[in-house]
Protein backbone atom coordinates (compact mmCIF):
# COMPACT_ATOMS: atom_id res chain seq x y z
CA UNK A 1 0.00 0.00 0.00
CA UNK A 2 1.02 3.56 -0.58
CA UNK A 3 -0.13 6.61 1.39
CA UNK A 4 -0.07 9.76 -0.75
CA UNK A 5 -0.02 13.26 0.71
CA UNK A 6 2.17 15.61 2.67
CA UNK A 7 2.65 15.30 6.40
CA UNK A 8 1.89 19.00 6.91
CA UNK A 9 -1.75 17.97 6.47
CA UNK A 10 -3.29 16.92 9.79
CA UNK A 11 -5.37 14.34 7.91
CA UNK A 12 -2.37 12.74 6.19
CA UNK A 13 -0.40 12.89 9.44
CA UNK A 14 -3.10 11.11 11.50
CA UNK A 15 -3.34 8.39 8.86
CA UNK A 16 0.45 7.98 8.69
CA UNK A 17 0.77 7.76 12.48
CA UNK A 18 -2.11 5.28 12.77
CA UNK A 19 -0.60 2.95 10.16
CA UNK A 20 2.76 3.11 11.96
CA UNK A 21 1.20 2.49 15.39
CA UNK A 22 -0.75 -0.48 14.03
CA UNK A 23 2.43 -1.90 12.49
CA UNK A 24 0.99 -1.92 8.97
CA UNK A 25 3.67 -1.66 6.27
CA UNK A 26 3.17 1.06 3.70
CA UNK A 27 5.08 3.38 1.42
CA UNK A 28 4.68 7.13 1.79
CA UNK A 29 4.66 9.37 -1.28
CA UNK A 30 4.87 13.04 -0.34
CA UNK A 31 2.86 14.93 -2.97
CA UNK A 32 1.23 18.32 -2.49
CA UNK A 33 -2.36 18.91 -3.53
CA UNK A 34 -1.22 22.44 -4.44
CA UNK A 35 2.21 22.02 -6.05
CA UNK A 36 1.92 18.53 -7.58
CA UNK A 37 -1.55 18.63 -9.10
CA UNK A 38 -0.80 16.69 -12.34
CA UNK A 39 1.06 13.93 -10.45
CA UNK A 40 -1.63 13.74 -7.77
CA UNK A 41 -4.45 13.72 -10.35
CA UNK A 42 -2.79 10.75 -12.08
CA UNK A 43 -3.09 8.83 -8.79
CA UNK A 44 -6.43 10.22 -7.65
CA UNK A 45 -8.56 12.46 -9.92
CA UNK A 46 -10.07 14.09 -6.80
CA UNK A 47 -6.61 15.42 -5.84
CA UNK A 48 -7.51 14.78 -2.20
CA UNK A 49 -5.11 13.92 0.59
CA UNK A 50 -4.71 11.51 2.11
CA UNK A 51 -5.07 8.98 -0.64
CA UNK A 52 -4.36 5.32 0.02
CA UNK A 53 -3.38 3.30 -3.04
CA UNK A 54 -3.78 -0.45 -2.66
CA UNK A 55 -1.41 -2.91 -4.32
CA UNK A 56 -4.09 -3.67 -6.93
CA UNK A 57 -4.33 0.04 -7.84
CA UNK A 58 -7.65 0.71 -6.10
CA UNK A 59 -7.77 4.07 -4.32
CA UNK A 60 -9.37 5.12 -1.02
CA UNK A 61 -9.68 8.71 0.25
CA UNK A 62 -10.65 10.35 3.55
CA UNK A 63 -8.54 9.84 6.64
CA UNK A 64 -11.40 8.43 8.73
CA UNK A 65 -12.25 5.80 6.12
CA UNK A 66 -8.60 4.88 5.60
CA UNK A 67 -8.08 4.57 9.35
CA UNK A 68 -11.20 2.38 9.65
CA UNK A 69 -9.70 0.13 6.96
CA UNK A 70 -6.32 0.04 8.71
CA UNK A 71 -8.02 -0.93 11.98
CA UNK A 72 -9.88 -3.67 10.10
CA UNK A 73 -6.71 -5.25 8.70
CA UNK A 74 -4.58 -4.78 11.82
CA UNK A 75 -3.42 -7.80 13.77
CA UNK A 76 -5.97 -9.07 16.31
CA UNK A 77 -5.74 -7.17 19.57
CA UNK A 78 -3.79 -4.34 17.95
CA UNK A 79 -6.64 -1.80 17.79
CA UNK A 80 -6.01 1.75 18.96
CA UNK A 81 -9.61 1.98 20.21
CA UNK A 82 -10.70 0.95 23.71
CA UNK A 83 -12.99 -2.07 24.06
CA UNK A 84 -15.20 -0.53 26.77
CA UNK A 85 -18.26 1.08 25.09
CA UNK A 86 -18.20 4.21 27.26
CA UNK A 87 -14.50 4.84 26.65
CA UNK A 88 -14.94 4.05 22.95
CA UNK A 89 -17.76 6.60 22.66
CA UNK A 90 -15.65 9.23 24.45
CA UNK A 91 -12.73 8.56 22.09
CA UNK A 92 -15.04 8.97 19.10
CA UNK A 93 -16.30 12.28 20.52
CA UNK A 94 -12.75 13.54 21.08
CA UNK A 95 -11.71 12.39 17.61
CA UNK A 96 -14.65 14.27 16.09
CA UNK A 97 -13.64 17.44 17.92
CA UNK A 98 -10.02 17.02 16.85
CA UNK A 99 -11.08 16.56 13.24
CA UNK A 100 -13.32 19.63 13.42
CA UNK A 101 -10.43 21.69 14.82
CA UNK A 102 -8.13 20.43 12.06
CA UNK A 103 -10.71 21.11 9.34
CA UNK A 104 -11.37 24.66 10.55
CA UNK A 105 -7.63 25.30 10.88
CA UNK A 106 -7.17 24.21 7.27
CA UNK A 107 -10.01 26.57 6.26
CA UNK A 108 -8.15 29.37 8.02
CA UNK A 109 -4.95 28.60 6.13
CA UNK A 110 -6.83 28.57 2.82
CA UNK A 111 -8.49 31.89 3.62
CA UNK A 112 -5.31 33.66 4.78
CA UNK A 113 -2.57 32.02 2.69
CA UNK A 114 -4.17 30.71 -0.49
CA UNK A 115 -7.03 33.08 -1.28
CA UNK A 116 -5.91 36.44 -2.74
CA UNK A 117 -6.16 39.31 -0.23
CA UNK A 118 -8.76 41.15 -2.27
CA UNK A 119 -11.04 38.09 -2.20
CA UNK A 120 -10.81 37.31 1.51
CA UNK A 121 -13.98 37.42 3.55
CA UNK A 122 -13.42 38.85 7.06
CA UNK A 123 -16.84 37.61 8.23
CA UNK A 124 -16.00 34.06 7.14
CA UNK A 125 -12.61 34.28 8.82
CA UNK A 126 -14.21 35.54 12.05
CA UNK A 127 -16.65 32.62 11.95
CA UNK A 128 -13.86 30.09 11.37
CA UNK A 129 -11.77 31.61 14.16
CA UNK A 130 -14.75 31.33 16.51
CA UNK A 131 -15.28 27.71 15.55
CA UNK A 132 -11.60 26.95 16.13
CA UNK A 133 -11.64 28.66 19.52
CA UNK A 134 -14.87 26.92 20.58
CA UNK A 135 -13.68 23.51 19.40
CA UNK A 136 -10.39 23.78 21.29
CA UNK A 137 -12.36 24.94 24.32
CA UNK A 138 -14.45 21.76 24.16
CA UNK A 139 -11.32 19.64 23.77
CA UNK A 140 -9.77 21.24 26.85
CA UNK A 141 -12.94 20.93 28.98
Where are each of the predicted segments found?
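Amphipathic alpha-helical packing segments from all-alpha helical-bundle domains
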Residues: 124-140
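GST-like domain detector, emphasizing the conserved glutathione-binding G-site
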Residues: 1-124
Amino acid sequence: MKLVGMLDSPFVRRTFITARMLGIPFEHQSLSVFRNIPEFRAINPLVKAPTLVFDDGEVMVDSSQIIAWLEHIAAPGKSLWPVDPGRYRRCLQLTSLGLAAAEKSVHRVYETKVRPKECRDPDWLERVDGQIRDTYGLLEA
